[in-house]
């Protein structure tokens, strides 16, 4: 899955892919665990905001992003998507567009649910932890 905020034409490593042989936009960062209604409403709202405010998306990125270094990302001005759920929660908290699109009640509820999910995730013991620490102790 893409890890950077980018778009490209036939680039499967970009967050948004605009295939040149079809009239469509693929959101490659979305996954099957998302709420499709919230994801679609935020994606469309962000697109509309970009059009209305004439926000230039930058140049398309058509090189393989999976093989680029951090310094190459910085040189091209490419930002990272959140690396984990906690970082995503913080990004959502600070996002002004989501205030408008989701409204205060939905946003507060979503943040509470995702914070609870993060806490439950950290209470689980993973297979890696069992294997790693049982061999040491």
Locations of regions flagged by a protein language model:
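Catalytic-core signal marking the mid-to-C-terminal active-site face
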Residues: 1-137
């Amino acid at each position: 899955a893409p890890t950077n905020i980018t778009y490209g034409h036939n680039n499967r490593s970009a967050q948004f892919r605009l295939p040149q042989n079809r009239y469509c936009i693929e959101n490659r960062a979305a996954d099957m665990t998302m709420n499709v209604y919230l994801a679609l409403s935020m994606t469309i709202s962000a697109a509309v905001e970009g059009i209305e405010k004439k926000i230039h998306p930058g140049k398309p990125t058509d090189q393989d992003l999976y093989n680029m270094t951090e310094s190459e990302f910085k040189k091209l001005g490419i930002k990272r998507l959140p690396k984990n759920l906690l970082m995503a929660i913080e990004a959502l908290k600070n996002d002004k567009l989501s205030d408008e699109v989701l409204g205060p009640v939905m946003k507060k509820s979503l943040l509470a649910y995702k914070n609870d999910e993060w806490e439950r995730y950290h209470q689980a013991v993973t297979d890696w932890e069992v294997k790693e620490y049982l061999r040491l102790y």
